[in-house]
């Protein structure tokens, strides 16, 4: 019998996936990715032999670790586990799973909960940016019950407010990809908003 790997499975925004401590996974990315493919059941359109839901929105992974960066609580690496391919990608970020990083960090004792609300400063490794997630923590415990609604998700839950620091140009290096607020291409003005 295998010993297993601790994992917290939860929804973040309109996605859901597995939240792991980095220390519980292989340090070698190739080994780690093979393990995650197995956990999710990929490649298979139904992911029948794993925990994935046969949809990119339910085949996601958050890897969380304590941070050594000044002023940062935790590091977050997002991985998309492809459903029908034996592939794992860190080429993008996921704001949906980001919303679950703070409650996970509190539940796994990476961050000490405060009375009422706990801010968690998160370094997003995929984009080298910082987000601050605020989690409701009455009695110093995460609450998942609340009246917040989001499109695409039935029911209500506790709101998690997320703010981002210094995100301008995180994907292309500039606020405006071409450096201009308006570009004319083939005689047509394109406004970059």
Predicted regions and their residues:
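A glycine-rich beta-to-alpha transition motif near the start of alpha/beta enzyme domains, typified by
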Residues: 1-193
């Amino acid at each position: 019998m295998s010993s297993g790997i601790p994992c917290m499975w939860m929804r973040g925004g309109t996605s859901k996936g597995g939240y792991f401590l980095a220390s519980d996974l292989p340090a070698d990315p190739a080994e780690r990715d093979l393990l995650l493919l197995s956990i999710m059941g990929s490649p298979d359109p139904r992911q029948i032999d794993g925990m994935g839901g046969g949809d990119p929105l339910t085949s996601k992974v958050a890897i969380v670790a304590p941070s050594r960066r000044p002023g940062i609580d935790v590091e977050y690496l997002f991985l998309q586990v492809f459903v029908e391919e034996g592939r794992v990608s860190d080429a993008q970020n996921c704001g949906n799973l980001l919303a679950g990083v703070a409650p996970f960090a509190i539940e796994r004792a990476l961050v000490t909960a405060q009375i009422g609300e706990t801010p968690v400063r998160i370094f997003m490794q995929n984009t080298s940016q910082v987000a601050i997630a605020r989690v409701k923590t009455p009695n110093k415990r995460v609450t998942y019950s609340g009246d917040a609604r989001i499109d695409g998700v039935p029911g209500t839950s506790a709101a998690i407010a997320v703010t981002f620091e210094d995100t301008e140009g995180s994907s292309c290096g500039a606020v405006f990809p071409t450096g201009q607020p308006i570009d004319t291409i083939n005689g047509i003005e394109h406004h970059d908003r």
